[in-house]
């Protein structure tokens, strides 16, 4: 059996991560990013580990750390491999990250890019969990955080360029089944 081939989708994500790292204030944070364990970690291979923070399975703490790092002047790329994990951080996301600029009277505009994956049913169907897309549900609760669905390779680099020049948080939704050719 041969190794899976990279697709234009995965290549665009990898290039976007390199682009993010051009800013010396960028920090990556998440589960299984320093130590390979999910498909997203494939997109950051070879990038400086000293600018990555490996977290345990503590999604709400990860979001809180992302907010704190952003308040300290960092651009944060926070990795959530699936929406089901981001749900666990909903309190920090909805009640803090979304409202921080307003709560601080504009003093803090947190530059947080949230990478979240829509779970796949390939090669195995995980059942009811880990494959839903909650973009619409979160979109109805978030008033100041745009959600962009990266449903084609052509959308990825422009979305990351927009995120890097914009002030404030953004959620970029990935489709991991598009990482590899079948």
Predicted regions and their residues:
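Thiamine diphosphate
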Residues: 1-182
């Amino acid at each position: 059996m041969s190794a899976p081939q990279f697709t234009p989708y995965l290549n665009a994500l990898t290039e976007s991560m390199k682009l993010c790292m051009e800013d010396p204030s960028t920090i990556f944070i998440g589960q299984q990013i320093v130590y390979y364990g999910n498909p997203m970690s494939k997109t950051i291979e070879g990038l400086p580990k000293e600018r990555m923070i490996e977290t345990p399975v503590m999604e709400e703490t990860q979001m809180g750390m992302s907010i704190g790092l952003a308040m300290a002047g960092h651009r944060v790329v926070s990795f959530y491999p699936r929406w089901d994990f981001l749900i666990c951080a909903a309190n920090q996301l909805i009640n803090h990250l979304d409202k921080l600029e307003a709560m601080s009277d504009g003093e803090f505009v947190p530059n947080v890019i949230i990478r979240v994956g829509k779970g796949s049913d390939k090669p195995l169907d995980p059942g009811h969990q880990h494959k839903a897309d909650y973009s619409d549900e979160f979109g109805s609760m978030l008033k100041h955080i745009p959600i962009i669905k990266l449903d084609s390779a052509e959308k990825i680099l422009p979305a990351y360029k927009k995120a890097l020049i914009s002030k404030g948080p953004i959620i970029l939704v990935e489709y991991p089944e598009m990482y590899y050719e079948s």
